Amino acid sequence: MRRRLHKTTLLFFISIGLITLDACRKKYYATAEDMAEYGWVMYETQDYLTSNTWFNSAVSEDVNWMDGYNGLGWSYAKLMVLDSSIDNFITGLGKPQDKWNPTDIHSEILAGLTFAYHAKGIDKKTIEYGRAFLDSTVRPLKAGWVFAHDSLLNYLDVRITLAASYFSVGKFDSASLNVQIVLDSLNSSVIAVSDTSLEGRKKMAEQISALQTSLLKQ
């Protein structure tokens, strides 16, 4: 009979390469969930190549494991293999989320797609997935989204990325609106630049860039 180990114990065995054990004639095995969880352990230590390997193992074990594709998307993005990142995120969107997983994986994938498309300079797709992310996460009296595997990354990073892409496609009013939301969320007294003259656009671009840099440190 096959049984699962306690999560902490199993992750330890995975870490030293013992995926299947035979003790007292009981088979203990690592599931796709376990492999994905260990992939996130590696991701959080910034070992993105190893984490990517474990996420690949997770989706090989269970082709419907949504969080495995989520992890592949994020780890490929960190490795700057952006096409593979996007492909896995999109595949993950079509998979069912495990009802016992408290993490909103769907929103993590939408955020990941926003960042990945922005890194590729595809602003229309950045806006498409950024707006889908906001539709998925913005609720009255609900705390803003924070990435479960990097607390420095949150909904404000998505907002400012969205603002940058709006600016790039010439939708300056939308860019300014998102900048103001970020500033208000930071309790800043600064007003978003709304002047769309040539000089105003230059200042708007500088404001967006400064906020992107500042948010990376918070």
Residue ranges and their predicted role:
Residues 164, 168-218:
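Terminal, low-structured helical/coil segments at or just beyond the last alpha-helical repeat
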